[in-house]
Amino acid sequence: MESLTLQPIARVDGAINLPGSKSVSNRALLLAALACGKTVLTNLLDSDDVRHMLNALSALGINYTLSADRTRCDITGNGGPLRASGALELFLGNAGTAMRPLAAALCLGQNEIVLTGEPRMKERPIGHLVDSLRQGGANIDYQEQENYPPLRLRGGFTGGDIEVDGSVSSQFLTALLMTAPLAPEDTTIRVKGELVSKPYIDITLNLMKTFGVEITNHHYQQFVVKGGQQYHSPGRYLVEGDASSASYFLAAGAIKGGTVKVTGIGRKSMQGDIRFADVLEKMGATITWGDDFIACTRGELHAIDMDMNHIPDAAMTIATTALFAKGTTTLRNIYNWRVKETDRLFAMATELRKVGAEVEEGHDYIRITPPAKLQHADIGTYNDHRMAMCFSLVALSDTPVTILDPKCTAKTFPDYFEQLARMSTPA
């Protein structure tokens, strides 16, 4: 297996313009494909997940052109639901941001379409979304294991009264919200359980509004969507920088700054993961906010005990930042780590122990006490981009760290290690 050993880093300083947000990129691509008119998307993320969405749209007859660096996409909308010319199988890798929204959107047509992906995708639950779509008339079969992809879709979604479980993934609600305006009937969506990652729903609602569709939101517990609507291209749309990707650089600034400035997001960002900066501030770093940037300056870091349900992806970065904080850090209400690219609670606990930390892994929490001195270890990444990027922070000590399968960062940030090296002064 390929590996990358990062030597100890003495200081991190400088600025980085963030690649586009994965969450925003894939939502914007789907809405542009469903919309009337031509849309020009700029600062699109070039990564595996976005390529899976683009490949699927192409197979569904959507015409688009990409710039040489794949960050600008000119896409001609279908002016309504996506249609396949015949029976079709779409391979979506391990891209939840493609699988969930497409599973819903493709229930508007009449074609037979199979959605499948990598082995890990077949372990990521989708049953709650399928149950909700069936309540709206969709005809869906499981091809292998009940409640998991691959799925066979045969259209049939018309809207109506629908319940969705909000406790596993906000992507299920996102998928229903983006599909419902194109259904023939009005749709009322009721959310059962505690809605996880609520800020991601704000991204969805924000983008739908940009594409000309408004819905009624009753305190995130009930959404009313008029049927028979159309999305309309906004013309040009700039994709915000990825706030989850910003977390690694901001944390590096907190641990070994200097000052690190990330551009492409700021105080007006629609992504909930910008709140990661508030957590670093609580831990002792200094944060400066601009409209289009966030800067973090080193401080003496101390442990925190916090509910991280609102920023589950960025919270992973706090788990490795905790190695540099005084005291025991507890991250709570993070059960949905278990249904991501890998079981991130298990993976994080396992790898933190390798570098010497004392770790308590609960059903939905993790408690981390740093060692007096970090140990050099080979870090397993579980084909999970965030594990690789989180554990790069271990090199901000006087100990090297070896990252196994470093190319797994291609899911959201193909040149992550080059960018980190550019801003780092070796010890």
Curated annotation (Swiss-Prot):
Catalytic residues (UniProt): D313
Gene3D superfamilies recorded: Enolpyruvate transferase domain
Pathway membership, UniProt: Metabolic intermediate biosynthesis; chorismate biosynthesis; chorismate from D-erythrose 4-phosphate and phosphoenolpyruvate: step 6/7
One GO CC term, this protein: cytoplasm
NAD as UniProt keyword: no
Cited SUPFAM superfamilies: EPT/RTPC-like (SSF55205)
UniProt xrefs under InterPro entries: Enolpyruvate_Tfrase_dom, Enolpyruvate_Tfrase_sf, EPSP_synthase, EPSP_synthase_CS, RNA3'P_cycl/enolpyr_Trfase_a/b
A biological process from GO: amino acid biosynthetic process
A Pfam short name: EPSP_synthase
Similarity-based family: Belongs to the EPSP synthase family.
Function: Catalyzes the transfer of the enolpyruvyl moiety of phosphoenolpyruvate (PEP) to the 5-hydroxyl of shikimate-3-phosphate (S3P) to produce enolpyruvyl shikimate-3-phosphate and inorganic phosphate.
Identification of the protein by name: 3-phosphoshikimate 1-carboxyvinyltransferase
Gene source species: Salmonella heidelberg (strain SL476)
Gene, per the UniProt record: aroA
